[in-house]
Curated annotation (Swiss-Prot):
Amino-acid positions noted as binding substrate in the UniProt annotation, renumbered to this chain: 73-80, 184-186, 197-199
Lineage: Bacteria, Bacillati, Actinomycetota, Actinomycetes, Kitasatosporales
Name by which UniProt lists this protein: Octanoyltransferase
UniProt miscellaneous comment: In the reaction, the free carboxyl group of octanoic acid is attached via an amide linkage to the epsilon-amino group of a specific lysine residue of lipoyl domains of lipoate-dependent enzymes.
Family matches, as SUPFAM superfamilies: Class II aaRS and biotin synthetases (SSF55681)
Pfam family, one: LplA-B_cat
Primary role: Catalyzes the transfer of endogenously produced octanoic acid from octanoyl-acyl-carrier-protein onto the lipoyl domains of lipoate-dependent enzymes. Lipoyl-ACP can also act as a substrate although octanoyl-ACP is likely to be the physiological substrate.
Metabolic or biological pathway, per its Swiss-Prot or TrEMBL entry: Protein modification; protein lipoylation via endogenous pathway; protein N(6)-(lipoyl)lysine from octanoyl-[acyl-carrier-protein]: step 1/2
Gene Ontology MF annotations: lipoyl(octanoyl) transferase activity
């Protein structure tokens, strides 16, 4: 991959309104498609805002009527705001684009970032993002032959079967206490170039998530680096660490197009008798 350029758009009092950053994404996306700029990662904070991906249901929006910006990324509703490091990597990928591989690269960079601050995180089968796994619990006894545990894959509309493999923790079917999401990822690819990206919770006010069903996932919580460590961590501290891991992962990735299964050749017609 080409050298990755970082652009710090604004943090703290200079946080960037979501619609302004979205327009900036579109401009950089067009420039990247035409090869006028290299692969670029926009880094910033937003003022408080809810954004809804294409598959957000009405029941998942804020119950109090708080305004929501509808966007063209995948996934469902989430919140952005102070204390959250947001990154929009705008990269040209080989076609057909392997979106899952791109998501995994972003997850790996954020997993390494969290590890540098002493927070152990993981992927979870079927779910994008970076997670702190819930503590193990003893297997609960069946009641009258009916197990009290459940398989979330049967009820989770967000479960993505492509997100699996040895690097993923198994779905939480009661064997752990509530898993907690540290970083959300939502991607769009247009003309072979990525948009949108990740949001890493550093030290936000997590009560903003109480008004919605974050990412459409009802059986998990939300956390932050500060909450997990029990001390204040700032976006300013995390920014250079995240940049280092994003550069290392994204610049050194061996990009390959998505494997496409070839149609099987038709069996030859039987010879006439």
């Amino acid at each position: 991959m080409s050298e990755l350029r970082f652009v710090r758009l604004g943090f703290g009092e200079q946080a960037v309104e979501y619609t302004e950053a979205w327009q900036k994404q579109r401009e950089v996306h067009a420039d990247r498609f035409e090869d006028r700029v290299p692969d670029t990662c926009l880094l910033l904070e937003h003022p408080p805002v809810y954004t809804a991906g294409r598959r957000t249901a009405e029941s998942e929006r804020p119950l109090d009527g708080t305004p929501v910006v509808d966007v063209d990324r995948g996934g469902k509703i989430t919140w952005h705001g102070p204390g959250q490091l947001v990154g929009y990597p705008i990269q040209k990928l080989p076609r057909p684009v392997d979106v899952v591989a791109h998501v995994r690269r972003l997850e790996e960079a954020l997993i390494r970032t969290a590890a540098d601050f002493g927070v152990e995180t993981s992927r979870i089968e079927g779910r994008s993002g970076v997670w702190v796994l819930g503590d193990p619990v003893e297997r609960r006894q069946a009641l009258g032959g009916l197990s009290l545990d459940f398989d979330p894959r049967l009820q989770d509309e967000e479960f993505d079967p492509r997100l699996n493999g040895p690097e993923y923790a198994p779905s939480n079917a009661g064997q752990r206490r509530e898993d907690r999401k540290l970083a959300a990822i939502g991607i769009r690819v247009a003309k072979g170039v990525t948009m949108h990206g990740f949001a890493l919770n550093v030290n936000p006010d997590n009560t903003w998530f109480d008004r919605i069903v974050p990412c459409g996932i009802r059986d998990a919580g939300v956390t932050s680096l500060s909450a997990e460590l029990g001390r204040e961590v700032t976006v300013e501290e995390v920014l250079p660490v995240a940049e280092r891991h994003l550069r290392d992962i994204l610049e050194n990735a061996e990009l390959a197009p998505r494997a496409v299964e070839q149609p099987k050749a038709a069996a030859p017609a039987p010879a006439p008798a």
